Amino acid sequence: PTTGVRAASGAYLRGRYRATRPATTTAVAAFFRNSTVSDQLQKFMFDAAPVRGEYVSLDATWRAVLERHDYPAPVRHLLGEMMAAAALLTANVKFDGALILQLHGDGPVAMIVVECNADLTMRATAKYSGEIPDDATLKALVNVDGRARFAITLDPRVKQPGQQPYQGVVPLSDEHGPLPDLASVLEHYMHHSEQLDTRLWLASDDRHAVGMLLQKLPGHGGTAGTGAERAPEQDEDMWNRVCQLGNTLKRDEMLSVDRETLLQRLFWEETVRVFEPAVTAFRCTCSHERVTNMLRTLGEAEVMSVFDERP
């Protein structure tokens, strides 16, 4: 399930679409001047297109995870991308509980688990073994023999008697073979399992984990907030146009340019409503009950395999 965007409290970026991307727009800059916290998730919506978006930047949140473990570069990159993705997906559902991404691999990375609560507090860990080349692909990391398992779990904060967490299985391949990266995996899942056209851009390094999500709004034609009707073909054209703008994003740009500047460059001539950002944070409140629940979520087979692999 997805949630509607809250009432706008920010500024507007107005204009017409062109294929170029110049630097700044004063109205949006005025809104962001009050947003000094780096660890934030920003929601936005296009007035002239049936599209909503989110942009997340994890800095201190991400570094708090890295301070606790020394991961090889490919593991760090995948873990950071999973954290950014978990924040984006959590902000996109109406749910009081935790969204958990669980990746159990058959390669050098045996397990990655990321948990994001409804208030965007997060924690994450990974288990790996052996030497891992810096250029290792997703398949080489977790799906060498095609036996990897990836799941999205929604674990309610308050459970009714007998209620079990919802879990969706996420394929790592499509009809053409293994999917190349985490963004492609989640896009494929959202399209085929949730029937939602979704695009994701993810990146991480030693200091930042960032991501952007664009999602086509369900329903028939109509300009957001105006009641004006459009043909489905117009909606599809607008969706494709916004995605083309997103495709101009480069990994280095996502990791080096602040959220304000990046959104201005991408959508400088679109009419975009910007909403009050939400703050992310690292939080690990381990307790006997929480550890027990985590082990139950992993399943007996996975827990026993960890013991079997101990020297």
What label would you give each PLM region?
Residues 249-311:
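Cys/His-clustered metal-coordination modules, chiefly Zn-binding fingers
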Residues 31-276:
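Interaction interfaces in information-processing and related assembly proteins
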Residues 1-34:
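N-terminal mitochondrial targeting presequence
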